[in-house]
């Protein structure tokens, strides 16, 4: 299945996010040093990862480090980078490894996964695992349109990228007691009722509305 994501988010929607949310997001990223002084390949400490499991960190499309950067000759990362950021968030939630956002974006452009005016082709997810999996400790674990498969994969420790209406998000966990899924949205907007720090949502939200899921793409951990 090839899904050309219509992920060119409305610029007005993106710019309407309030300054407080952006400030909180930037503050949350500062683990020890700024990104500009760190190598592109780093791993968070176990204590930080445990903390992020309870309050997951989300890399956003409008981070000033890449928001205005052109993405493939049309549009920018802030409006069209959801497929890239969903991949980064899925890997980070999986094992604490940060993939360089623009390295992945440039790879998508180079290999023609960037579709100007439409977003990012879903082939990037398997390709990213093949290209960067060994470096960042993850592997491709298939794709499905089934909620039951999603639940099974999450219980086994996978994370998922989800194609919803005109957008990609990530799902990093499933709570058996509440029967809810932990969703990470790199461009949280009122129309999706998502937030900066992840949202536990019921299956009903994955079956209808702005988060109606069309397909799931899975990553599993592998040896570095």
Regions found by a protein language model. Give the residues of each.
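Active-site-adjacent structural segments surrounding the nucleophilic cysteine of cysteine proteases
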Residues: 1-115
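Conserved active-site-adjacent core of cysteine acyl-enzyme catalytic domains
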Residues: 7, 92-224
């Amino acid at each position: 299945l090839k899904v050309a994501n219509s992920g060119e988010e409305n610029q007005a929607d993106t710019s309407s996010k309030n300054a407080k949310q952006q400030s909180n997001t930037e503050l949350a990223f500062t683990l020890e040093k700024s990104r500009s002084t760190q190598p592109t390949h780093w791993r968070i400490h176990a204590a930080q990862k445990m903390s992020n499991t309870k309050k997951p960190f989300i890399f956003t499309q409008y981070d000033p480090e890449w928001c205005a950067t052109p993405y493939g000759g049309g549009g920018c990362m802030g409006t069209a980078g959801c497929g890239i950021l969903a991949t980064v968030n899925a890997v980070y939630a999986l094992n604490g490894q940060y993939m360089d956002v623009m390295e992945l974006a440039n790879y998508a452009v180079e290999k023609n996964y960037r579709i100007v005016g439409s977003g990012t082709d879903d082939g990037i997810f398997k390709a990213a695992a093949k290209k960067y999996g060994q470096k960042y400790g993850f592997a491709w674990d298939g794709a499905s349109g089934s909620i039951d498969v999603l639940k099974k994969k999450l219980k086994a420790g996978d994370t998922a990228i989800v194609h919803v209406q005109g957008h990609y998000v990530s799902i990093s966990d499933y709570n058996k007691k509440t029967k809810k899924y932990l969703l990470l949205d790199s461009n949280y907007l009122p129309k999706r009722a998502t937030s900066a720090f992840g949202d536990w949502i019921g299956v009903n939200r994955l079956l209808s509305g702005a988060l109606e899921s069309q397909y799931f793409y899975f990553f599993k951990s592998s040896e570095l």
